[in-house]
């Protein structure tokens, strides 16, 4: 067994060898606790038939743990300075492919078909860069990729929002979007002390398993999410005010919007954060016919 990368000593040794300096703009924080990495991989439930996608491998700490368990690992790294380091640290493994590209610009469908030929179980497992967490997760979900799901580490406050329930302060349009596509569960909290450099916030690991079907029936997905976003535009305002002020033609259609709310058993004085996904689905399906 090769010596783990994710220890304070080995990580510092690698960084010093290459004279690597962290780029704050890329949200680089390297994990130096092997036990936490192993737990993350455990939560992903990989087998020797699984293809794993990683985003932001850093110096390869999580990548090597994935390589020991998965059939193949494909990792997207945006920072060119890390490529020679990864080539060195991951040289003992023959089942890893590093792609030097911004994952937000990548054609992941093509990568999956080329790199994971014949594999039916594909998981995303990553310690996501904090500054682009939400765009990355939403791209992975809205691109309708053939993945089982993802196990990702992110800022704890973002994880709380993804898994939040109606009526809580963390519940918002992001919670609904994530839970529309996946079953979301926060599986572990990670203290800031196990990173180099140490971030200002704690992290959490969230597991998102893709749903075969959304939990609600909506006639127009794009309009459903438009209604959801409008409802949370100003959290302290009522659902009626938010819809009137933030939907196209909302002001001209105030009476119709109020009538639809009443007909769908939603008190116009309620706030968006109190509505369940089922209520948002009923509301958007009804609004679609009057706006």
Swiss-Prot record:
Record: residues binding S-adenosyl-L-methionine: 29, 31, 56, 77, 102, 127
Enzyme Commission number(s) from the entry: 2.1.1.182
Cellular compartments per GO CC: cytosol
Catalysed reactions, semicolon-separated: adenosine(1518)/adenosine(1519) in 16S rRNA + 4 S-adenosyl-L-methionine = N(6)-dimethyladenosine(1518)/N(6)-dimethyladenosine(1519) in 16S rRNA + 4 S-adenosyl-L-homocysteine + 4 H(+)
Enzyme class: transferase
Pfam hit, one: RrnaAD
PROSITE patterns: RRNA_A_DIMETH (PS01131), SAM_RNA_A_N6_MT (PS51689)
Gene3D superfamilies: Ribosomal RNA adenine dimethylase-like, domain 2, Vaccinia Virus protein VP39
GO MF annotation terms: 16S rRNA (adenine(1518)-N(6)/adenine(1519)-N(6))-dimethyltransferase activity; RNA binding
Family, as annotated: Belongs to the class I-like SAM-binding methyltransferase superfamily. rRNA adenine N(6)-methyltransferase family. RsmA subfamily.
NCBIfam families xref list: ksgA
Function: Specifically dimethylates two adjacent adenosines (A1518 and A1519) in the loop of a conserved hairpin near the 3'-end of 16S rRNA in the 30S particle. May play a critical role in biogenesis of 30S subunits.
Protein name in UniProt: Ribosomal RNA small subunit methyltransferase A
UniProt gene name: rsmA
């Amino acid at each position: 067994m090769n010596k783990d990368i994710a220890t304070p000593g080995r990580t510092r040794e690698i960084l010093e060898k290459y004279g690597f300096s962290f780029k704050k703009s890329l949200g680089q924080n390297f994990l130096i606790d092997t036990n936490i990495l192993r737990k993350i991989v455990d939560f992903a439930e990989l087998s020797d038939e699984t293809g794993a996608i990683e985003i932001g491998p850093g110096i390869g700490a999580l990548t090597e743990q994935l390589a020991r368990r998965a059939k193949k690992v494909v990792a997207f790294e945006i920072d060119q300075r890390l490529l020679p380091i990864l080539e060195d640290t991951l040289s003992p493994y023959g089942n890893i492919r590093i792609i030097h590209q911004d994952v937000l610009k990548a054609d992941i469908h093509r990568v999956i078909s080329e790199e994971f030929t014949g594999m039916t179980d594909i998981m995303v497992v990553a310690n996501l860069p904090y500054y682009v967490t939400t765009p990355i997760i939403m791209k992975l979900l809205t691109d309708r990729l053939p993945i089982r799901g993802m196990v990702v580490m992110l800022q704890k406050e973002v994880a709380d929002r993804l898994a939040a329930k109606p009526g809580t302060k963390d519940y918002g349009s992001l919670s609904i979007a994530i839970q529309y596509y996946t079953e979301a569960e926060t599986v572990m909290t990670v203290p800031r002390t196990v990173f180099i450099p140490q971030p200002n916030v704690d992290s959490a690991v969230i597991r998102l398993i893709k749903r075969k079907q959304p939990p609600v029936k909506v006639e127009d997905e794009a309009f459903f999410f438009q209604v959801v976003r409008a409802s949370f535009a100003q959290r302290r305002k009522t659902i009626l005010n938010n819809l009137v002020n933030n939907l196209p033609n909302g002001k001209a259609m105030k009476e119709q919007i109020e009538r639809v709310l009443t007909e769908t058993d939603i008190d116009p004085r309620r706030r968006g954060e109190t509505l369940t996904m089922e209520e948002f689905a009923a509301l958007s399906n009804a609004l679609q016919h009057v706006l």
